[in-house]
Regions:
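Non-heme Fe(II)/2-oxoglutarate
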Residues: 5-7, 11-116
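Catalytic core of non-heme Fe(II) oxygenases with the double-stranded beta-helix
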Residues: 93, 97, 101-216
Length: 216
C-alpha cells in the first residue's frame, strides 16, 4: 500500500502564505500523483485502506439536510470527523481519517502556517448527474456555526463538472455576489476563509467527489 509521508523538505516547496481574511487559494497538484491515485482508488475505486473498503451513506440533501427551501438533491456522504459544538472536542468518526492526514498537514501549513492539524470537521461527498427540474445552485452556506473561525480545505478527488462557488458575503443574504468559481480537477485543492458563504453546482455530466475538512 502506498503511504504519503510529509517531510520538511516537501513542505518547504509549498509557499508559506497564511490565509488572509476572506482569501481564496486554488492550488493544482497539491499532493503527489501517487497519493492522488490512492485517494481516488479508495473512495471511488476498489482499493482497500488498511484492509477496509470505503463505505458511503445516503443523504437526501447535499447541503441543506432537508430544509424546506432547499433543492433536495441527494448524494452519498462519509463523515471523518464530527463537529458537535464549540464546547466539545471534535470526534473522529472514521478509520479513513488517517488517509488524509498528509493532505491536511499540507493544507494546515499553507493556510495556517503550522503542520499541526486541528481538524474540526471532515466529510466527503459523492454526487451523480441528476435529471434536474431546475438548475439553481445548492443553498449557500458555511460549514460550521457562525463566528467559529476556521479555514476550509476542499480537495477534488477526480475531474468533473459541478463548480464550487465562493461568495463575497459572510452571512445569509437575499442576493449573493460571486467571489470565485472553481472547477473540480483531480489533485486540485481550494483553501479559503471559512467565514465565506459558498455552495456548489449540481454535476450534470460526471461523478463529483470531494474531501472537505474544516481546520482551526
Amino acid at each position: 500500500m502506498f503511504t504519503e509521508i510529509v517531510t520538511l523538505s516537501a513542505l518547504v516547496k509549498i509557499t508559506l502564505t497564511m490565509i488572509k481574511e476572506h482569501e481564496v487559494l486554488v492550488i493544482d497538484d497539491f499532493i503527489s500523483t501517487e497519493y492522488q491515485e490512492q485517494i481516488k482508488n479508495t473512495l471511488i475505486g476498489e482499493a482497500l485502506f488498511n484492509g477496509h473498503e470505503f463505505p458511503w451513506h445516503y443523504i437526501e440533501d447535499v447541503t441543506a439536510c432537508g430544509d424546506h427551501d432547499s433543492q433536495h438533491r441527494p448524494a452519498l456522504y462519509h463523515q471523518y470527523i464530527d463537529f458537535i459544538n464549540e464546547d466539545q472536542k471534535p470526534v473522529v468518526d472514521s478509520k479513513f481519517h488517517d488517509l488524509f492526514v498528509p493532505l491536511l498537514q499540507r493544507g494546515s501549513f499553507k493556510g495556517l502556517g503550522t503542520t499541526k492539524v486541528n481538524a474540526l470537521q471532515g466529510r466527503s461527498f459523492l454526487q451523480f448527474p441528476l435529471n434536474l427540474k431546475n438548475y439553481d445552485v445548492d443553498n449557500p452556506h458555511i460549514d460550521l456555526v457562525e463566528g467559529h473561525k476556521h479555514i476550509v480545505v476542499l480537495y477534488y478527488v477526480c475531474d468533473s463538472d459541478g463548480d464550487t462557488i465562493i461568495y463575497n458575503e459572510t452571512k445569509e443574504s437575499d442576493q449573493y455576489t460571486v467571489k470565485q468559481r472553481v472547477t473540480p480537477k483531480q489533485g486540485r485543492v481550494v483553501i479559503f476563509d471559512g467565514v465565506l458563504m459558498h455552495t456548489a453546482e449540481q454535476p450534470l455530466n460526471n461523478t463529483r467527489c470531494i474531501v472537505n475538512y474544516n481546520l482551526g
